[in-house]
């Protein structure tokens, strides 16, 4: 089977990673001891992708848990599914990264990285045919962003032909822990552009807005935000975990979704949006699901898709529904909104259907969009970065760990280049290339 090795780094990465394992263990009928209690062969059909079958028929997540301080790991270990993980796969330091990217990437993190790679190697060796890696982390802190990107580049060195996929939580002033988040995020994006194949941008700004506006939670907690993240992660990995044809592995997903290597930052979406612990009383129809998942308010990145154009889209419907109706609705969306899809990639919307819905819902839909509107997110970070960097505010924390100002300048311009590239393809039309030839032909006539 085609296995995926999961890594989670830093406080945020470990918290959303732990939620992810709770949700998918539940979907696959695996209890906190790793024992299967399911009721459908579909649950076990591709269980090997994320789980290793250990002695005694126990299923153990192919997960490596990393942090530079022991706190979060302890709470994962004592949490609901803490005992399902392999004890040797917890790798942690004591010093912490203090929300400093340089500590995670160059000093503290660099000291721990080899012991993490040993565990990664061991996990990779127990795979039949490893398809790739996925990392959950945030870009605003020190460990997830600094050490997370260090791990990515080290793994890339050792496994250059495997797919590298990240779930990256993008910082926002609305849900802020630290004033230096724009620095950490920009330095991280600088790495992600070069070293990952697919990055799901999970934007705290959007999560907060969804909780506040749609779910009417006046003071959203991290638990509320993480509920949305785990629903999204469960949705986008559905095709990898259950039998099906479309985007059934990370590479096929990348081939469908990434038209240019640097433009691999996806905007995830989910429908229906429900708050934690609530059940859905009315089952949604396929047209409602389709309409909701293309709605900007359902996007997990705070970008308005109507401000850009889709290069590519993948949609995953879950639950018992008519394939014919799904296809009709998806075509309907494209025909009505054709100006929001680039015309120079025909058939750029792909749809998959999985019979098993998420817990508590009869039907759900997950959206993965590669939209040029994602530039809004990078612009937002870039503006905050520039405001501080212009005055060299807080820089001494980074240069003190041996970093050079030059690296900041490079990261800044790499991110600005990324924004321009998205803009360039947003403005591109199918005709542009042909204009010159036509002129030549006219003269001949």
Curated annotation (Swiss-Prot):
Residues 429-445 have a biased composition (Acidic residues). Residues 425-445 are annotated as: Disordered. Mg(2+) binds at residue 69. GO terms for biological process: microtubule-based process. Transmembrane segments: none annotated. A motif (MREI motif) lies at residues 1-4. GTP binds at residues 11, 69, 138, 142-144, 204, 226. Its cofactor is Mg(2+). Some glutamate residues at the C-terminus are polyglycylated, resulting in polyglycine chains on the gamma-carboxyl group. Glycylation is mainly limited to tubulin incorporated into axonemes (cilia and flagella) whereas glutamylation is prevalent in neuronal cells, centrioles, axonemes, and the mitotic spindle. Both modifications can coexist on the same protein on adjacent residues, and lowering polyglycylation levels increases polyglutamylation, and reciprocally. The precise function of polyglycylation is still unclear. Some glutamate residues at the C-terminus are polyglutamylated, resulting in polyglutamate chains on the gamma-carboxyl group. Polyglutamylation plays a key role in microtubule severing by spastin (SPAST). SPAST preferentially recognizes and acts on microtubules decorated with short polyglutamate tails: severing activity by SPAST increases as the number of glutamates per tubulin rises from one to eight, but decreases beyond this glutamylation threshold. It is found in: Cytoplasm, Cytoskeleton. One of its GO terms (molecular function) is structural constituent of cytoskeleton. GO terms for cellular component: cytoplasm; microtubule. InterPro entries: Beta-tubulin_BS, Beta_tubulin, Tub_FtsZ_C, Tubulin, Tubulin/FtsZ-like_C, Tubulin/FtsZ_2-layer-sand-dom, Tubulin/FtsZ_GTPase_sf, Tubulin_C. Keywords: Cytoplasm, Cytoskeleton, GTP-binding, Isopeptide bond, Magnesium, Metal-binding, Microtubule, Nucleotide-binding. The modification 5-glutamyl polyglutamate is found at residue 438. Belongs to the tubulin family. The MREI motif is common among all beta-tubulin isoforms and may be critical for tubulin autoregulation. Tubulin is the major constituent of microtubules, a cylinder consisting of laterally associated linear protofilaments composed of alpha- and beta-tubulin heterodimers. Microtubules grow by the addition of GTP-tubulin dimers to the microtubule end, where a stabilizing cap forms. Below the cap, tubulin dimers are in GDP-bound state, owing to GTPase activity of alpha-tubulin. Dimer of alpha and beta chains. A typical microtubule is a hollow water-filled tube with an outer diameter of 25 nm and an inner diameter of 15 nM. Alpha-beta heterodimers associate head-to-tail to form protofilaments running lengthwise along the microtubule wall with the beta-tubulin subunit facing the microtubule plus end conferring a structural polarity. Microtubules usually have 13 protofilaments but different protofilament numbers can be found in some organisms and specialized cells. This is Tubulin beta-1 chain. The lineage of its organism: Eukaryota, Metazoa, Chordata, Craniata, Vertebrata.
């Amino acid at each position: 089977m085609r296995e995926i090795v999961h890594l989670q780094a830093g406080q945020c990465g470990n918290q959303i990673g732990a939620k992810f394992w709770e949700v998918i263990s539940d979907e696959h009928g695996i209890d906190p001891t790793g024992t299967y209690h399911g009721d459908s062969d579909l649950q076990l059909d591709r269980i090997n992708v994320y789980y290793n079958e250990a002695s005694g028929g126990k299923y153990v997540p192919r997960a490596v848990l990393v942090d530079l301080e022991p706190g979060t790991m302890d709470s994962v270990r004592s949490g609901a599914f803490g005992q399902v993980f392999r004890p040797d796969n917890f790798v942690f330091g004591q010093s912490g990264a203090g929300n400093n990217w340089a500590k995670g990437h160059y000093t503290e993190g660099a000291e721990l990285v080899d012991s993490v790679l040993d565990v990664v190697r061991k996990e990779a060796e127990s795979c039949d045919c490893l398809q790739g890696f996925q990392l959950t982390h945030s870009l605003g802190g020190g460990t997830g962003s600094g050490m997370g990107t260090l791990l990515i580049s080290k793994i890339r060195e050792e496994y250059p032909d495997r797919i590298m996929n990240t779930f990256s939580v993008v910082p926002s002033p609305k849900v802020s822990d630290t004033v230096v988040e724009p620095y950490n995020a920009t330095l991280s994006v600088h790495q992600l552009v070069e070293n990952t194949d697919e990055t799901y941008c999970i934007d705290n700004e959007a999560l907060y807005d969804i909780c506040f506006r749609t779910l009417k939670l006046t003071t959203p907690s991290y638990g509320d935000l993480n509920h949305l993240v785990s629903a999204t992660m469960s949705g986008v990995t559905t095709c990898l975990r259950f039998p099906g044809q479309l985007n059934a592995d990370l590479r096929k997903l990348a081939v469908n979704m990434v038209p240019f290597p640097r433009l691999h930052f996806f905007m995830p979406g989910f429908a229906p949006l429900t708050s934690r612990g609530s059940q859905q009383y009315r089952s949604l129809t396929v047209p409602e699901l389709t309409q909701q998942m293309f709605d900007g308010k359902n996007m997990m990145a705070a970008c308005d898709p109507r401000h850009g154009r889709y290069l590519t889209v993948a949609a995953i419907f879950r639950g018992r529904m008519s394939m014919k109706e799904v296809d009709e609705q998806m075509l309907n969306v494209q025909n009505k909104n054709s100006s929001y899809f680039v015309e120079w990639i025909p058939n750029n919307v792909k749809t998959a259907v999985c019979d098993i819905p998420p817990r508590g819902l009869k039907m759900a839909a997950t959206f993965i969009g590669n939209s040029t509107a994602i530039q809004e997110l990078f612009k937002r970070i870039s503006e905050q970065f520039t405001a501080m960097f212009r005055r060299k505010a807080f820089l001494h924390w980074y240069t003190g760990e041996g970093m050079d100002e030059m690296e900041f300048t490079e990261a800044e311009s790499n991110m600005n280049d990324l924004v321009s590239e998205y803009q360039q393809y947003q403005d591109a039309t199918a005709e542009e290339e042909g204009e010159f030839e036509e002129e030549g032909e006219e003269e001949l006539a």
